[in-house]
């Protein structure tokens, strides 16, 4: 009896699974979107179980080689399309309606809520408009002072290793420096991560990012309903660390809101006005200050609204900057002629004193360093994947993408395609000075900060932060090619499982 019942349930499940998928399967076949062999119910889940951050880049490169520029995977009931075809990039990224992140990222909502990264529709539009003043050039000028000061702290920390013989993994140093910058520019508080890496907020954030990164690569941990069952200890640790972060941020918000209310009460309050020449002036406006003064539909943002945006800013800014700077310094250490050109430009623009402060204007004059950063982000893009959710059938040329599908745009593989970049595996900053090369490259073949309506709102901030830190390090140290080479690893960002290793040798001061 029970055996027959079990067989009946199994048959019904298989029929249900097949009927649920059949329309999309037929559509994929007509559009010649192929992929690995699937089995009922779990789809490609067994292949996904063997996927690790360390083998992700190689595995998906193999899939592209086998199935062409676009292929599909089924993970349990979720359909995923992966593509490096620019016609998909254009249709998806230019759309004003396809703004929802791929379902792959929905587990981040417990951490980031409805912040700019995950929100859509009117909420996303309103929030983005509210955040715009934080990236006004006047605010950025004040932020550069914070970037410069914290890069100086990192340079001091590196002195203990600057003997020309010791191999240093720069990733951990850059990560703490980037966190100091993002927290101070976001909230106006100094967590002093570089001097106090065990500060509760710092430890909690690093733990949350680590766990969430592991979840992205783990089928058993990715789904919210399965996570507490598959890894209960990790689940409880994540909840505890998120609470530590939120309690800290909430406390800062309450304190800053109280200061704002007192200013309104005693008549010293000065409202934020876009276009005001003094925006970000003496008060040195932070992201938090701007959010506290903002309104949506004539209503102030709640503490939860503000915390979500602060958390997104810190989460996105810390990791992406760390990836970009670490890979740039590693590449510079392996290319002495490039390093020499950078140093000559730094002395020419910033002067011979390695401790001289930088300004936004001076950083913008570093054109060769711009090319080095661009080339780094081409070969080692901090964000190698862009995901969107397709709710309804979408026609792209002759191809139909069925609704209820997540599409993952894979710029990492575009950047290494000789169709768009000659000698794609060669680190060659000069390619960005060649007008012929840049003019012949399709616009969407290089999108380190994404493109379209949902591009990165903080890209100017990120470029300044990278230039401030790289310029400070190169003015103080010659970078040497010590340690293991890179081994690409993907979580939320691109990193290296072998570290970003260099040697350091103090520079002789130029007189």
Curated annotation (Swiss-Prot):
Listed cofactors: heme
Top EC category: oxidoreductase
Record has Iron-sulfur as a keyword: no
Record-level Gene Ontology MF annotations: heme binding; iron ion binding; monooxygenase activity; oxidoreductase activity, acting on paired donors, with incorporation or reduction of molecular oxygen
Pfam family, one: p450
Membrane topology: Peripheral membrane protein
PROSITE patterns: CYTOCHROME_P450
A GO cellular component annotation in the UniProt record: cytoplasm
Similarity annotation: Belongs to the cytochrome P450 family.
Protein name: Probable cytochrome P450 4d21
Native organism: Drosophila melanogaster
